[in-house]
Design a protein with these regions (language model features):
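Active-site beta-loop-alpha junctions enriched in small/polar residues
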Residues: 10, 54-55, 78-87, 120, ...
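Short, electropositive alpha-helical surface patch
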Residues: 59-74, 132-138, 142
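Anion (oxyanion) recognition and catalysis
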Residues: 42, 67, 149
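Histidine/acidic residue-rich metal-binding segments in metalloenzymes
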Residues: 98-119, 123-160
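Active-site mouth loops of central-metabolism enzymes
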Residues: 18-33, 84-102, 154-160
Length: 160
């Protein structure tokens, strides 16, 4: 039997309009939108979804109902980014390593399957493909990865 998977989803997005998607979930998770997304995945034979997390608790809810659709859904619940850098739309910010460790614990407490760290910004095509915001240092990435591993979690990295 073939298995089709989506390996970098954001269940809170709708694939059309970022602002509309955020507004839909801003004050509460839209159960209907999540159920429609899972029904569409199932219709297309997608049985595995790895989400990249969000700041609105949508993937947290989605992780609870995915089995109803026969979907193996994995999520960090939210991504973790350095304060003042890219990542606010998908997660929580940290300033020091202790604060980062607290967020790792929160992911684990929420039932997250892995840690997602934002190591860079995004491509800015208005400036010929430069990457927004300063990337994390090699030492920061190593320390963050070690802290996640110490908590028994693997790491997914956002990199551009």
């Amino acid at each position: 039997m073939k298995m089709f998977g989506e390996c970098h989803a954001h269940i809170f997005l709708n694939g059309r309009n970022y602002k509309e998607a955020v507004a839909l979930h801003k004050n509460h998770v839209s159960e209907e939108a999540i159920r429609q997304a899972f029904a569409e995945y199932r219709k297309r034979g997608i049985t595995f979804v790895r989400d990249g997390g969000d700041a609105l608790h949508v993937s947290e809810y989605a992780s609870k109902i995915a089995p109803q659709y026969g979907i193996d859904y994995r999520s960090p619940m939210f991504a973790i980014h350095r304060k003042g850098h890219y990542g606010r739309i998908v997660g929580c910010a940290w300033e020091g390593l202790e604060e980062y460790r607290d967020l790792v614990k929160k992911v684990k407490d929420l039932g997250g399957d892995f840690i997602k760290i934002m190591t860079t910004g995004i491509l800015d095509f208005a400036t010929k493909g430069h990457v927004t915001s300063e990337p994390l240092s090699r030492e920061e990435v190593f320390a963050m990865t070690a802290a996640a591993h110490d908590a028994g979690l693997s790491v997914m990295a956002h990199v551009n």
